Amino acid sequence: MQKKIKVLCVDDSALIRSLMTEIINSQPDMEVCATAPDPLVARELIKQHNPDVLTLDVEMPRMDGLDFLEKLMRLRPMPVVMVSSLTERGSEITLRALELGAVDFVTKPRVGIRDGMLEYAEKLADKVRAASRARVRQNPQPHAAAAAAAHGQTAAAAPLINNPLVSTEKLIIVGASTGGTEAIREVLTPLPPDAPAVLIAQHMPPGFTRSFAQRLNGLCRISVKEAEHGERVLPGHAYIAPGHAHLLLARSGANYIAHLSDDPPVNRHRPSVDVLFRSAAQHAGKNALGVILTGMGRDGAAGLLEMKKAGAYTFAQDEASCVVFGMPREAIAMGGVDDVAPLSDMSRRIMARLASMGDRVQRV
């Protein structure tokens, strides 16, 4: 009999603890081994139960979730799924938690509202399963490299790429899920200010993508923003799919245009990586580079293969540097990947490939 995933739920709301316990215990492969109203109680329960996964509320009394997470990742690294409110403050704190080493996050369940609860339960269970298999980063220190990149200094973990490029038609198309927020940061921060435009589909709910874009914009030398429908896609800019919509690449004459769609989810996701990749295959062809990063599931694998068939050069993050080696594994298995790269070298390889593409990208 397969061993069940042991989950410790930490939340100051007894109602939320009860609801999370009900959802997790309804799954055949996982169980709640204990619950805690605050991090100080959780600390003792971790010693007693040795859980496989921790779900952690962002804001709690006695010690907030971030302080506890920082100590936990330093002293006893383990997979953590943050539980966050759908507020601007909640999204900012959650992004900081992902920087500190949390594997993923879910929004708080809406107590007393049954509509959508089955979908929420499936999402929570999927994230707990993925977290139980995730590679937890030991003592993550994201700010040093990111701050260095923002100020034009070289950091050992993320050397800046200073090959000036002039390109009006090259595009970098990126897809990610679990662990993707930090992977995307590591890919974007070394890019030079005149890098080709970057379009990104990261699995993330509404309300979080804007904060994610704003956070990256303060760390990167390129401009980063949440994509808007109909806007022109420009070099030196990165466009992140909003949490409520698919992002597609479109054309208006010689110009690339961002197109947002509220079509149904694809592979259970909106935004979907496959949707973005397929639009890039159709409208950019060999002028695009496709990049699939860490994430559970298979979203993006088929789309990356379509990009490759259309002439694009494609990259996948390697297993050793992925938090969850799901999407890249599927893309590699389908034959849609030209180059498998560690995350620490991904930006350099992308820019080297662009520089090798002849008269379509020139050094100056």
UniProtKB/Swiss-Prot annotation:
GO molecular function: phosphorelay response regulator activity; protein-glutamate methylesterase activity; protein-glutamine glutaminase activity
Keywords: Chemotaxis, Cytoplasm, Hydrolase, Phosphoprotein
Superkingdom per UniProt: Bacteria
Record EC number: 3.1.1.61, 3.5.1.44
Active site positions, chain numbering: 177, 203, 299
Post-translational modification: Phosphorylated by CheA. Phosphorylation of the N-terminal regulatory domain activates the methylesterase activity.
Domain CheB-type methylesterase residues, every copy: 165-357
UniProt GO BP: chemotaxis
Notes concerning its domains: Contains a C-terminal catalytic domain, and an N-terminal region which modulates catalytic activity.
Name of the molecule in the record: Protein-glutamate methylesterase/protein-glutamine glutaminase 1
Species of provenance: Burkholderia thailandensis (strain ATCC 700388 / DSM 13276 / CCUG 48851 / CIP 106301 / E264)
